[in-house]
C-alpha cells in the first residue's frame, strides 16, 4: 500500500467570514489547529507568513526569525513539517493594488520586505519552498499602469527573491 502524505494550512479552518457575510463561528487558536491537524494524521503544515508569525508587521527581522524558530520547535514536537511559506500580500493596504506591480515604490518595497520575511521564515522552519500567490497583481484597469512596466516589476521582484541566499 502507498504511503500518502497530506498537508493543510491554518486558514483551512476559519471563522467562515467571506465577501458574502460575517463570521459564523469563533476563531480557533493557530496552535490548537496545528495540534488537531497532527492528531488527524497530516504530515505537514502550509503557512502564510502571517500564519507562522501573527502580526508580522509589528516585528523586526530578528524577532520574526525567533518566532519562526519557536514555531519550528512546536512543529517538531508534533512530528510535523512545514511544507511551504507564502507571503500573504493581498490583505494589507500596501498591496491592495498588487504589491510587486504597484505604481507606488513604497508599496513595492513593502511587498519585497514581506517576500524576504517569507523566505526567512521558510528557512527557519526548514520548509523546502515558498509559494507566490499573485492574488492582486495584474493590470485589470489598463489605464492604471503599463502592462509592460508592471510585468517588468514582477520579474524584477521574482529575480530578487531568487537571488536571496537561502535554503529555499
Predicted regions, residues:
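N-terminal pre-domain/capping segments
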Residues: 1-129, 148, 152-163
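Short, conserved phosphate-binding/catalytic loop or strand-edge motifs used
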Residues: 132-139
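Flexible, glycine-rich active-site loops centered on histidine and acidic residues
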Residues: 139-147
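Conserved small/polar residues in nucleotide/adenosyl-binding loops
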Residues: 167-168
Amino acid at each position: 500500500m502507498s504511503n500518502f502524505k497530506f498537508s493543510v494550512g491554518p486558514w483551512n479552518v476559519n471563522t467562515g467570514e467571506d465577501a458574502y457575510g460575517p463570521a459564523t463561528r469563533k476563531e480557533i487558536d493557530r496552535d490548537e489547529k496545528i495540534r488537531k491537524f497532527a492528531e488527524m494524521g497530516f504530515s505537514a503544515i502550509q503557512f502564510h507568513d502571517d500564519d507562522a508569525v501573527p502580526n508580522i508587521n509589528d516585528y523586526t527581522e530578528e524577532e520574526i526569525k525567533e518566532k519562526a524558530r519557536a514555531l519550528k520547535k512546536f512543529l517538531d514536537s508534533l512530528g510535523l513539517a512545514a511544507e511551504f511559506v507564502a507571503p500573504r500580500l493581498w490583505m494589507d493596504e500596501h498591496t491592495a493594488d498588487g504589491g510587486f506591480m504597484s505604481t507606488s515604490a513604497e508599496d513595492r518595497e513593502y511587498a519585497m520586505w514581506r517576500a524576504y520575511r517569507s523566505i526567512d521564515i521558510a528557512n527557519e522552519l526548514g520548509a523546502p519552498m515558498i509559494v507566490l500567490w499573485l492574488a492582486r497583481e495584474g493590470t485589470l484597469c489598463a489605464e492604471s499602469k503599463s502592462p509592460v512596466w508592471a510585468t517588468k516589476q514582477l520579474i524584477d521582484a521574482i529575480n530578487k527573491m531568487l537571488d536571496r541566499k537561502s535554503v529555499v
